[in-house]
Regions:
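PEST-like low-complexity, intrinsically disordered acidic/proline/serine-rich tracts
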Residues: 1-158
Length: 158
């Protein structure tokens, strides 16, 4: 059985994300100024719209990595084959297809090249007893810009 936590953050151990070198509101202000000066903004084309509004991925990190429920459409369907686990998310019909291996070492050795950035990152899985462990790296930077839980480009979620 797991442990009760007050935070999704496990590193640092106190569960508190360190302060940003530059406060987020300053970054948002700079982003607004850039939009104002260049004309590139919410009305300039679909690329400027949020990913969920473009139906590329669901909002609220429903499909992960770090799968978080939202107020509605939080149903997940798990499909398991001998060498894959698929997690189908009701919100925006996102799907995570996770290859599974005999061990963590084998899983990590079979990762996709970093140049292949995918929505929801590169996930591999293995079983420890009857527990499925999923490790995700190489999360698409564009997806990271709109996350509620910040993750660095070199971050890893297990």
């Amino acid at each position: 059985m797991g442990e009760f936590r007050t935070s999704y953050v496990i590193d640092p151990p106190n569960g508190q994300i360190p302060r940003l070198a530059e406060p987020l509101y300053d970054l948002e202000r700079k982003n607004f100024r850039y939009r104002y000066l260049t004309g590139i903004g919410d009305n300039s084309g679909p690329e400027a719209l949020p990913l969920a509004e473009r139906c590329l991925i669901g909002f609220g990190n429903t499909a992960g990595p770090g799968m978080m429920g939202t107020l509605y459409n939080s149903t997940y369907q798990f499909i398991q084959t001998p060498d894959h686990v698929a997690i189908i998310v009701e919100m925006a019909h996102d799907a995570r297809i996770i290859p599974t291996y005999a061990s963590a070492e084998e899983a990590r050795a079979n990762r996709r090249p970093d140049v292949l950035e995918q929505w929801f990152g590169d996930s591999v899985g293995w079983y420890e007893g009857d527990t499925l462990v999923v490790e995700t790296v190489n999360i698409k930077p564009l997806q990271m810009q709109q996350r509620s839980v910040p993750i660095s480009p070199s971050g890893k979620i297990t």
